[in-house]
Amino acid sequence: MDKRKEFEALVREYSETLYWLIRRIVLTHEDANDVLQNTFLKAWNAYDSFNRDSKLSTWLTRIAINESTDQLRRNKHLASAAAEDLSVAKSLLADEFFDGDATEAMLQEAIASLPEVQRTVFTLRYYEEMKYSEISKILNTSEGALKASYHIAVKKITEYFKERD
Amino acid sequence: MNEEMYIQEKVGKRNPFRVPEGYFDNLTAQVMQNLPEQPERRAKSVFMRPVFYAAASVCALLVAGAAWMWRPAAEVSSTAPVQANAVAQPQQQESAEGYFDEAADYMMLDNHEIYAYLADSY
């Protein structure tokens, strides 16, 4: 099959799943769309060197997470440059593409306050319900370290809610 | 109560995010439209390849030279006093390290670039 056609089939198969994963990390639709486009651009440019023994979904998820993390860093830089202090929860509740309630917005704010690794591990485990063995392959981290990160993330989020109850 | 259960009971796992109408219908076409016709490989690896081979040759020569200088004392001269060789060695070592630094400076390569070439080549 033509390489481009083969890649198009891959985009069709994985784009929606990857979009939701990215969206849960970067939160806004605009950013998620940009990150998704960049993810496939990176994947296309590295497609020839992709090791066919590896799982395609693992490879794509890894690129998507790296791109999402880069986007968060860029946003952080822009936010501090503009000295914006609007909370994540308030921003989400004002977003036309967020239809959650205040508690759901608070959970997103709590997740957003976590360090990068804990945030990623929590998203993959809690929402995607991914096995630690799979997360380990994506993030290239030991299962023990991932379990510790998830446990700390859950504890911090719980404390976040209890402090505001 | 289990802390994970606390979060699940308080918030749940519902997806609160939405996308514009018809977003996923056009997504594949939109992604494909933004891709170049052919994958774009980094130009640097092709451009720098001759430099890498030159650097590898210089390193090989330096290693061969160092091995020759530090060959066992008995092979250098059976009549030379052992003490003289023992005193001379640190000086030679310093001198060889100097050659490596000079060579690296001359080639304007650092370890990251060498690793990048090795990654590209294999």
Where are these regions (language model features)?
Chain A
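Short, charged helix-capping/linker segments at alpha-helix termini
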Residues: 1-9, 19-38, 48, 143, ...
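C-terminal edge and immediately downstream basic/flexible tail or linker adjoining helix-turn-helix-like DNA-binding
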Residues: 5-8, 27, 78-82, 137-140, ...
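A short pre-motif secondary-structure segment
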Residues: 121-125
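Short, small-hydrophobic-rich alpha-helical interface motif
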Residues: 18, 22, 32-43, 63, ...
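Internal acidic/polar
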Residues: 78-101, 131
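DNA-recognition helix of helix-turn-helix
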Residues: 58, 65, 69, 139-164
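Sigma70-family region 2
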Residues: 38-55, 75
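Arg/Lys-rich amphipathic alpha helix in sigma70-family domain 2
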Residues: 49-51, 62-82, 100, 152
